[in-house]
Regions:
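Catalytic cores of TIM-barrel enzymes
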Residues: 1-116
Length: 116
């Protein structure tokens, strides 16, 4: 079965040749550009012949645009929280909506477009 046929059959509760397979991996400090993130995800899928890609940008991408400061240490170490924009209760009132098509989210969206 092709990857797509296997997934569609499984979702339709039909017999498959095997259970669809995927998993994710984070590539610390290698995944901050859209093209590199796409390359890493596609390479892992091809190497392991997975049925689908579970996109895995670095774990804190979703909070950076809200004002979280990261400590990016480099090497195999993942970025960690350096400073939160929330230091006192009133700080919650300063949080403004962020766009889902800009900033860190845009990096992830662009990587998915490239990988497609």
């Amino acid at each position: 079965m092709s990857h797509r046929a296997r997934i569609e059959a499984a979702l339709a509760n039909l017999p498959t040749d095997r259970t669809p397979l995927s998993f994710w991996w984070h590539w610390a400090n290698q995944d901050r550009s859209p093209r590199r993130l796409a390359e890493l995800a596609v390479r892992l899928q091809q190497r392991l012949d997975m049925d689908f890609i579970k996109f895995s940008p670095y774990g804190l991408y979703s909070v950076v645009d809200w004002g979280v400061q990261l400590n990016v240490r480099g090497g195999p170490d993942t970025p960690i929280l350096a400073e939160s924009p929330i230091q006192k209760p009133d700080d919650w009132l300063k949080i403004m909506p962020v766009r889902s098509d800009a900033g860190e989210y845009l990096i992830v969206l662009e990587a998915q477009r490239i990988a497609h």
